């Protein structure tokens, strides 16, 4: 399992196409417009959007199979961190289960 110990970023597995990333970003802000009257606004509406998108669209972690010490992903699968708030250095925790 891969997970960032935060609630404003997510780990996901998807195609590494920059156009898809732009579509995902647009979907976040279409679903959760920053102009909405959010109640969690201490750090600005973008922070509320990040929390909502992590919880309701992405989830904050993903599982990835490991075989012979390497990620065993499909041709179009790539694991990446989705930054939903402010760019910053992030930690990603890894948990390994099994043999």
Residue ranges and their predicted role:
Residues 1-99:
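Active-site histidine-anchored catalytic micro-motif
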